[in-house]
Design a protein with these regions (language model features):
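C-terminal, low-ordered peptide segments at domain boundaries
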Residues: 102, 114, 280-281, 288-289, ...
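Catalytic nucleophile loop of clan PA
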Residues: 44-45, 156-177, 259, 398-399, ...
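Flexible, gly/ser-rich surface segments that form the specificity/activation loops bordering the active-site cleft
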Residues: 3, 7, 58-60, 83, ...
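Catalytic-histidine neighborhood of serine endopeptidases
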Residues: 47-90, 95-100, 112-113, 118-123, ...
């Protein structure tokens, strides 16, 4: 179905070009700021108050954001970020000094059908050999071909610059254009975030817990459990013909909301808030865009802190039971950090830079097998780790080759540590050897360095002068104690 001409007039004034001026730190050398960069995407007004929807990846590193509405001229308008939801790749921004009279109408992405005609709308950037060519607003017609991992799949090309733009169906926005797969057999496969995902993100309307930049980072719930697929014959045997479909719980993580629900490993989950669960962990009868959906995709239907009912068969009590749980956002320890909104801490000691492990480090070091394995294991992402992001040349760690970049620090002064807070506590308890204070730093592989604190601080002063990074409170304490000079005389 073509877009009505009356709707097109609204679209031309409500779909905006977003210019994001971004900064990032060097995640191996966090005292250095990377060169500013400028990116472009698309967004669209959703109300008369100046709220604009777009993708999180368009603006999540932006220090400054501007929009342009080419149909109304070349003037730029300042924007601020209201929230980002990295898991959904959704961001809401708001104009500071402009309110649009035009905005689009949001549809219902739950009611979509395969084969429906859609329109991808945005400001694509054409990539040439020498420069990027910024195009005017472009309409691309396509067809809904299904869903993958909870995203709407279309045969429409989503080019650079289109990200964050609206996906229209029946004159309403039913998705946010997100990405395109490329390859010999993958061209013209685009994905969009269902618009209903935005509708469940109502945290920003009533929350008062904003950080210092007044930007809300919305995390999402996860049941944090593992299960085994089953067969009807198996379930009939172990439940004496009481259950024919469901999944057997094999593990429940300590951080899971299921931990206090009464559900235990061995129990059989059959229903999540009215959605029957099949033997392979998909919705039994409910289909979206022609296919059953996984439990994780099903959770995308619910709001943060919403209460849902889970029905299960208690294998020990041999009876059907139900429990209500609250879908609380999960605080993953290994996650993406955004320096524009969040303080990023690091600690330099003994010629090494130590940081709390983040997803930013994993992205930067894609070929590291140990880091990659963490990115593939949700249970491992719930654990804090202290990572070595850099080892300075000529430091004892570098000379001895005992501790290397991307190693994990497990003990400091024989005290177990897994984050910077633990490191600070351990540093207050130096080892005493022959009446001298020492510091010992040990990896999870048992490799360590052991140095007198005085030598450690003297070396760090030299590194600080050479590599131009600030000394920390640990250094300042011992500089004063030992009467050391902070000027490098070499």
């Amino acid at each position: 179905m073509k877009i009505k001409e009356s709707i097109k007039k609204i679209i031309n004034s409500s779909v905006v070009r977003i210019i994001a001026e971004s900064i990032d730190i060097n995640w191996n050398l966090p005292y250095l700021i990377d060169e500013p960069s400028k990116g472009q995407g698309t967004g669209f007004f959703i109300d008369k108050h100046g709220h604009i929807l777009t993708c999180s990846h368009v603006v999540d590193g932006a220090k400054n954001i501007y929009i342009e509405i080419p149909s109304l001229g070349n003037e730029k308008y300042n924007c601020k970020i209201i929230f980002i939801c990295p898991e959904f790749d959704i961001a809401l921004i708001k104009t500071v000094d402009y309110h649009s009279r035009y905005y689009v109408e949001l549809g219902d992405s739950d009611k979509l059908e395969v084969g429906k005609e859609v329109q991808v709308i945005g400001y694509p950037v054409s990539l040439t050999k020498n420069k990027n060519i910024i195009n005017n607003l472009k309409y691309t017609v396509g067809i809904i071909s299904g869903q993958q991992n909870g995203k709407i799949q279309t045969d429409s090309a989503i080019n650079p610059g289109n990200s964050g733009g609206p996906l229209f169906c029946n004159n309403k926005v039913i998705g946010i254009n997100s990405m395109k797969l490329v390859g010999d057999s993958l061209d013209n496969i685009g994905f969009a975030i269902p618009i209903n995902y935005f509708k469940v993100l109502d945290d920003w309307k009533n929350t008062k817990i904003l950080n210092s930049k007044n930007t809300l980072i919305i995390e999402r719930p996860d049941l944090l459990f593992e299960y085994n697929n089953t067969t009807t014959d198996l379930l009939i045997d172990i439940t004496k013909n009481k259950i024919k479909e469901g999944i057997i719980v094999s593990d429940i993580y300590n951080e899971s909301v299921l931990k206090k629900s009464g559900i235990k490993p061995g129990d059989i989950i059959t229903d999540i808030d009215g959605y029957q669960i099949s033997n392979n962990g998909l919705t039994r009868s409910y289909k979206w865009l022609g296919t059953q959906i996984s439990i994780n995709v099903l959770l995308n239907k619910f709001k943060n802190n919403e209460s849902i009912k889970i029905k299960y068969f208690d294998i020990k009590k041999n009876k059907y039971m139900s429990t209500n749980i609250k879908l609380e956002p999960v605080d993953f320890k290994v996650k993406l950090y955004f320096p524009v909104f969040e303080k990023v801490d690091y600690f330099i000691i003994s010629g090494m830079i130590l940081m709390n492990l983040s997803y930013n480090h994993i992205i930067l070091n894609k070929k590291n097998i140990e880091l990659f394995s963490i990115s593939q294991n949700i249970k491992e992402q719930l654990k804090s780790r202290l990572i070595v992001t850099f080892v300075f040349p000529n430091s004892s760690a570098n000379i001895l080759n005992n501790i290397k970049q991307n190693n994990f620090i497990e003990k400091v002064n024989n005290i177990k540590v897994n984050d910077l807070n633990g490191l600070h506590r351990a540093l207050k308890r130096p080892l005493i050897i022959n009446k001298k204070e020492f510091i010992k730093i040990e990896t999870n592989k048992g490799k360590f360095i052991l140095n007198p604190i005085k030598k450690c601080v003297e070396d760090d002063i030299n590194y600080a002068n050479t590599y131009k990074y600030p000394l920390n409170e640990f250094h300042n304490k011992y500089i004063k104690k030992y009467g050391l000079s902070i000027i490098n005389n070499k």
